[in-house]
Amino acid sequence: MHPTRTKLLAAAALLAALAAPAGAADVTLLNVSYDPTRELYEQVNSAFAAQWKASRGQGLTVKQSHGGSGKQARAVLDGLEADVVTLALAYDVDAVAKGGLVKPDWQKRLPDNASPYTSTIVFLVRKGNPKGIKDWNDLVRPGVQVITPNPKTSGGARWNYLAAWAYAHQAFKGDEAKVKGFIKALFANVPVLDSGARGSTTTFVERGIGDVLLAWENEAFLAVDRLGKGELEIVVPKLSILAEPPVAVVDSVVDRRGTRAVAEAYLEFLYTEQGQEIAARNHYRPRNAKVAARYASAFPKVQLVTVDGAFGGWQQAQKTHFADGGLFDQLYTPGR
């Protein structure tokens, strides 16, 4: 992200904070997010609420809702009153926009297509890596159990699937029959499809099911730091995908509730140096160059494809792979 844009956002957030009368009544926001962002937004909410209180004299409570990204988008469309959505992929925010709740230009309102941090997909294995898993090709071996959520409900699962497809496309030099065979074999090794990424982490870590978990990079680090107790290891594949989780104000809700100023400032805070520092501490890759340099050693180098470059964008990827009757439905056989 360009440093001048960062300074402008910080100034805009401060001006928004100073614009309202001091001592205004306390305000509440609802952030509807995807599955593994709980810890990130607990820290963001605390820091932003303190800043908002100091600058405006107004108390702020940010409530959180978490689940599979697709399910969360549908919940907002069905009436869950989110002031902001912080979802796993642009397609899910576009779905909310198509429902008339978010304006179509939402990606142009904030830098980096309204994606303040990035992540990627890595493997989480058990201590000592007993199955010797090093790259995607190891996931289709007989006897290897792979844990991943359901791409029909989970944004992380869609990133997992597309990363696997991108690997196979490169490995098989674009031979679509072989790519499909690879994906079919991979999902034949999946014993259970949870609805969201955190559910899959629970299945792998707490229930002890599976040999390898396909995980958001931040979720894998969190599992090792706080859940694994020295019993888990991260394996970084040679190729993965650049995951760009987006954020947006839900226009219809903030205009009805009168929370637009605080909701916009909340999302702008994610781009400030403080917000980027919080993201990096929670193992999300920051956009801010200065913060990224400080945390460079924390993030492994990996070849990353993009959804736009490899799949023609999220609209095309969704239609081809994840829509009813799409390639995922064709290649996945439940209960195998």
Task: Please provide the spans of the model-predicted regions.
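Short helix-loop capping/hinge motifs at secondary-structure junctions, enriched
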Residues: 128-134, 153, 166-174, 253-261
